[in-house]
């Protein structure tokens, strides 16, 4: 696809394409090796390395060839550590160098004339060099060389059999007289033969010498033997597993090949010492809950029956909610990846990369709430990712059709030509320039290149200029012209009307487009804005993502997709390789539908007041799900398998053959299971299984065909697919695009070679038209699923119902980082949107309570999905339960009768179990107590505000058809750090928790004053009520701090609420009259001074 083709706009009902031209450019060069070696400088003293006796550059270390001159080499051996400064390998003694302590014992090695047989020619360097070269740089006796005579090969004896194909370095040492002529002289290393027709010779030795002279029997020899034995055991183990070619050919790359055959990842179960006590306390807590509820139900409070009934109902609901949340954590696991093995298998140096291509999706809607600079940093981090350039394509979806986003992306593509080579040259992290230059670290650490400081300063200056240009575009966009925006060539911007515009595609960078400043190729960068027309349901973000799926299938069709929010940049450039360790693993990869990474955030205050990091969910719940069927999809930072998004069933797992007569005697089979096998034998022969594609007709279980039933790569497989699959059914399912339908049959990706770029561009415009999805399965069984504003839950749920599994990957360096809402109001609105999406799923046909039975969804995985759509309903009992303490303190009643010793035991046992469960959960997961406690606090804050409103809004939408508007969460800019934390924005979500706080404060004051007036007898029952009230206040404390805002700055709304509720409190105070002693007897009326 030509990157300079220009912006292409089109419509589904207009048979035309409009192309707006743009410009492009590129260039590059290399040097030579020999001159560089000749001028190599010693890394110790700075002098030239110089040449050795053979005329080649002097090499001190044969392991790493670290540049060291002869003088420094002699000094380090004599006075220094005697080791290479780089690889720490001990320097070996070279010819002509003085001996030092620690050199290996060699007979006569100090006598050059006797060692090399110079015969008086020790001053002839040419003779010495030729002798050493013929000896393969070994310590042989050059003078003993005789004219070459082939020596009969003496193979090793292995298990009593002769093996003739053993490589030379594995032959045994043999005396020189073996071979009838001793053509090998007294050499102790094999002779190098240039003629391949000459048989390989055995290693000869002098029988008059002791074997220790050749290294046999020494400590070093024993260590080598132990290492060799371990290697043989490892090779034997791999051989038993049936992997590879084990003919003993002695290939030098064999260790690397062994490593490449190893698994690319492995599961790391939580140690039993940490997880078993956790499981035990869960079981104990269940038992204690049973006894606790038995007591609560059997001992009602007669004088406060309503309070007792409400509390019991709430407690039962909390217990059920805890069970739904707890049991998916029963089998938590962690995972490790091996990037070196991935490279050895799929990305060998000097060979074309075999890594799978990946399409990156970035979605944005409103540049006023999602700053273009934030989006630009995300795109730059993608373009500079550590992955083969030809395998990366980045698609940016602009669902707001904003010219500001288009122009910012154009500037980003130009800056990428400088930024991408800088990142890859110096291997910096992270590769989003805004966050890289904000790092408060010593950037000189571990950077030895002298040019790094200079180039970093120049790059920072270029980035500041880039920011100025982006901010200028933002400032210009604040004033919209009356006639609308126009492009540089004078044509009107096609997206002036956000709700009525054609589809637009612009390829900024690509394989044939602009190159970077060093002349290297850049990844493809494509701008996409789908068509919008009045009267069509565009399905918000889910519809935009499905449009990107179709466009990318037409233009690049990578088998894997990565979707990111515009404010989530790649923090670990090797994140995609981490995902490929699972996706491309030949053992487990075929059944993996997506790899989910945890969300990590920048710019959050140290205390994380509103639990923005959500550590408990990402480090506890998701690890638990990974041990079942995989984590749920959270909307960003996820690598998908394209075929799984197309609604295909997961490949069927081949079951191992059962133990039948192949491994048991015939008489055993006849006796033990004769009836069963006899019955099978008498049945009709099974018809031959045909490998075909099929569609399931059930509406709620209508995935496409199972990919596992197609043999990829078989002769004529593609022809069979096209012939077997009904074309009409495919078009009805995927839409009326023959190019796109054909791409869905390519499991390993790739575009159609017969299609021209012009035809692909036309198809790309067609598949993003607003009417393309009509009467298809898009949003129902294919792609991102419609029906909820939290499309991520539905999408992952449908994949798991098709039998796929997902993977949770937590690299040591966070893969992606994003921005989180800092102020209280934005955080509550974010939680409101999530909860509203769950309520919508609860009332839809895809509710996990009744959808997907009989499919591939596992039982505990269903528990998790049920919990994810039921949790907003917990807000109703939570609100009631948080109100009870204030009512109890104001009325003098309580939700429990007077406790007996047995009842106190159950109450104390339950509290201890709750406490110990939290401690053990933090212990096995590694979550800090601060994060765990913030999560508990915000569970109450969100429950009595956002979740409560989500339930009522969801009911209004279902029952009355009142739709709620989707609000994009504002992304952080580059203002003062944590300035948004103290910003107060009034919203109705603040009313319920504010009321709860004031009610409980009033209740505490009323209860204490009542106890003071009634004497010490009432203090005992008061402690239980006060504990109950303080439990509520402590959980709402972060909300109280957010409500007050900065010090000495109380919001007006708080003052108004305080006055209003103070008035109510005054009326209650008069009604309670706490200063009047309460008696059960008759009231005495004051009738004057003399009452008698």
Curated annotation (Swiss-Prot):
A Gene Ontology CC term for this entry? plasma membrane
Give the species. Oryza sativa subsp. japonica (Rice)
Q: Which UniProt keywords apply?
A: Cell membrane, Cell wall biogenesis/degradation, Cellulose biosynthesis, Coiled coil, Glycosyltransferase, Manganese, Membrane, Metal-binding, Transferase, Transmembrane, Transmembrane helix, Zinc, Zinc-finger
Residues that bind Zn(2+) 1: 42, 45, 69, 72
In this protein, the active site sits at 399, 792
Is the keyword Transmembrane assigned to this protein?
Answer: yes
Q: What is its EC number?
A: 2.4.1.12
What does the entry give for GO biological process? cell wall organization; cellulose biosynthetic process; plant-type primary cell wall biogenesis
Any stretches that span the bilayer, and where are they? 281-301, 304-324, 869-889, 902-922, 938-958, 988-1008, 1020-1040, 1050-1070
The record places its RING-type zinc fingers at 42-88
Give the protein's recorded name. Answer: Probable cellulose synthase A catalytic subunit 6 [UDP-forming]
Q: Required cofactors, per record?
A: Mn(2+); Zn(2+)
- This protein's gene is called CESA6
Question: What InterPro entries has UniProt attached to this entry?
Answer: Cellulose_synth, CES_Znf_RING, Nucleotide-diphossugar_trans, Znf_RING, Znf_RING/FYVE/PHD
């Amino acid at each position: 696809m030509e990157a300079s083709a220009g912006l292409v706009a089109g419509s589904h009902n207009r048979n035309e394409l409009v192309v707006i031209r743009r410009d492009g450019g590129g260039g590059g060069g290399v040097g030579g090796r020999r001159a560089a070696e000749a001028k190599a400088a010693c890394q110790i003293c700075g002098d030239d390395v110089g040449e050795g006796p053979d005329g080649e550059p002097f090499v001190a270390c044969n392991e790493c060839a670290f540049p060291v001159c002869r003088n420094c080499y002699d000094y380090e051996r004599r006075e220094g550590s005697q080791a290479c400064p780089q690889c720490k390998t001990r320097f070996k003694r070279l010819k002509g160098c003085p001996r030092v302590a620690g050199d290996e014992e060699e007979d006569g090695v100090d006598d050059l004339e006797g060692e090399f047989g110079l015969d008086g020619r020790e001053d002839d360097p040419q003779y010495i060099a030729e002798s050493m070269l013929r000896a393969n740089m070994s310590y042989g006796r050059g003078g003993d060389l005789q004219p070459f005579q082939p020596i009969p090969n003496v193979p090793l004896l292995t298990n009593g059999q002769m093996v003739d194909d053993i490589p030379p370095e594995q032959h045994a040492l043999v005396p020189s007289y073996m071979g009838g002529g001793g053509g090998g002289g007294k050499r102790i290393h094999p002779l190098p033969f240039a003629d391949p027709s000459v048989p390989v010779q055995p290693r000869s030795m002098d029988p008059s010498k002791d074997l220790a002279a050749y290294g046999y029997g020494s400590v070093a020899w024993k260590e080598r033997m132990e290492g060799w034995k371990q290697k043989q055991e490892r090779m034997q183990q791999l051989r038993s597993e049936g992997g590879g070619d084990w003919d003993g050919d002695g290939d030098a790359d064999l260790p690397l090949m062994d490593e490449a055959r190893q698994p690319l990842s492995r599961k790391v179960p939580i140690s039993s010492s940490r997880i078993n006590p956790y499981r035990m306390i869960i079981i104990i807590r269940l038992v204690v809950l049973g006894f606790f509820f038995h007591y609560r139900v059997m001992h009602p409070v007669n004088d406060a029956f309503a309070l007792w009934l409400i509390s019991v109902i709430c407690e039962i609901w909390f217990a059920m909610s805890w069970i739904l949340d707890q049991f998916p954590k029963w089998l938590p696991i962690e995972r490790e990846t091996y990037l070196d093995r991935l490279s050895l298998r799929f990305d060998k140096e000097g060979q074309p990369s075999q890594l799978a291509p990946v399409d990156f999706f970035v979605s944005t809607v409103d540049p006023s709430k999602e700053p273009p600079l934030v989006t630009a940093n995300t795109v730059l981090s993608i373009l500079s990712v550590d992955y083969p350039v030809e395998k990366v394509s980045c698609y940016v979806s602009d669902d707001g059709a904003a010219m500001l986003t288009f122009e910012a992306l154009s500037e980003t593509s130009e800056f990428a030509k400088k930024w991408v080579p800088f990142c890859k040259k110096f291997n910096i992290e992270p590769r989003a320039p805004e966050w890289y230059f904000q790092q408060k670290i010593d950037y000189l650490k571990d950077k030895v290149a002298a040019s790094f400081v200079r180039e970093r300063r120049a790059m920072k200056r270029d980035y500041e200029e880039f920011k100025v240009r982006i901010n200028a575009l933002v400032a210009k966009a604040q004033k919209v012209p009356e006639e609308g925006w126009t492009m540089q060539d004078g044509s009107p911007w096609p997206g002036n009307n956000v709700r009525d515009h054609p589809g637009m595609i612009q390829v900024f960078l690509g394989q044939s487009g602009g190159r970077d400043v060093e002349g290297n190729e850049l990844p493809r960068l494509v701008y996409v804005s789908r068509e919008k027309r009045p009267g069509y349901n565009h399905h918000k973000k889910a519809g935009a993502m499905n449009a990107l799926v179709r466009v990318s299938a037409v233009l690049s069709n990578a088998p894997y997709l990565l979707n990111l929010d515009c404010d989530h940049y790649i923090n670990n450039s090797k994140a995609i390789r981490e995902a490929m360790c699972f996706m491309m693993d030949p053992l487990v990869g075929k059944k993996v539908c997506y790899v989910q990474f945890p969300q990590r955030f920048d710019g959050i205050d140290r205390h994380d007041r509103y639990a923005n990091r959500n550590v408990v969910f990402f480090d506890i719940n998701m690890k638990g799900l990974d041990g079942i069927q995989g984590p749920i999809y959270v909307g960003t930072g996820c690598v998908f398998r394209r075929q799984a998004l197309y609604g295909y069933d997961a490949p069927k797992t081949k079951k191992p053959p059962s133990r039948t007569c192949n491994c048991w005697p015939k008489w055993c089979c006849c006796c033990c299971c004769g009836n069963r096998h006899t019955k099978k034998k008498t049945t009709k022969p099974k018809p031959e299984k045909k490998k075909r594609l099929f569609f399931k007709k059930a509406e709620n279980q209508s995935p496409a065909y199972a990919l596992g039933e197609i043999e990829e790569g078989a002769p004529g497989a593609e022809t069979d697919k096209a012939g077997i699959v009904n074309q009409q059914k495919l078009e009805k399912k995927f839409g009326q695009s023959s190019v796109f339908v054909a791409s869905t049959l390519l499991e390993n990706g790739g575009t159609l070679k017969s299609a021209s770029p012009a035809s692909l561009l036309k198809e790309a415009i067609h598949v993003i038209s607003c009417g393309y999805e009509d009467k298809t399965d898009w949003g129902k069984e294919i792609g991102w699923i419609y029906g909820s504003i939290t499309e991520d839950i539905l999408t992952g749920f449908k994949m798991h119902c098709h039998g796929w599994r997902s993977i949770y990957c937590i690299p040591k360096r966070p893969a992606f980082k994003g921005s989180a809402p800092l102020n209280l109001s934005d955080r509550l609105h974010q939680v409101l949107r999530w909860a509203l999406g769950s309520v919508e799923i609860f009332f839809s046909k895809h509710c996990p309570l009744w959808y997907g039975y009989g499919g591939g969804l596992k039982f505990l995985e269903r528990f998790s999905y049920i919990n994810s759509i039921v949790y907003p309903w917990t807000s109703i009992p939570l609100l009631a339960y948080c109100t009870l303490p204030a009512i109890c303190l104001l009325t003098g009643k309580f939700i429990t009768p007077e406790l007996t010793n047995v009842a106190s035991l159950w109450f104390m046992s339950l509290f201890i179990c709750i406490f110990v469960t939290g401690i053990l959960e933090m212990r096995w997961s590694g979550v800090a107590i601060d994060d765990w406690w913030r999560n508990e606090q915000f569970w109450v804050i969100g429950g009595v505000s956002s979740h409560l409103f989500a339930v009522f809004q969801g009911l209004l939408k279902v029952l009355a058809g009142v739709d709620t508007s989707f609000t994009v969460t504002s992304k952080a800019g580059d203002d003062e750090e944590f300035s948004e934390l103290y910003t107060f924005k009034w919203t109705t979500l603040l009313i319920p928790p504010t009321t709860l706080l004031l009610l409980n404060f009033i209740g505490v004051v009323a209860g204490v004053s009542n106890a003071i007036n009634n004497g010490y007898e009432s203090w005992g029952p008061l402690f239980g009520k006060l504990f109950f009230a303080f439990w509520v206040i402590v959980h709402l404390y972060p909300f109280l701090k957010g409500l007050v805002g900065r010090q000495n700055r109380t919001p007006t709304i708080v003052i108004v609420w305080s006055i209003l509720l103070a008035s109510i409190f005054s009326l209650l105070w008069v009604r309670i009259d706490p200063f009047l002693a309460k008696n059960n007897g008759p009231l005495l009326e004051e009738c004057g001074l003399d009452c008698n």
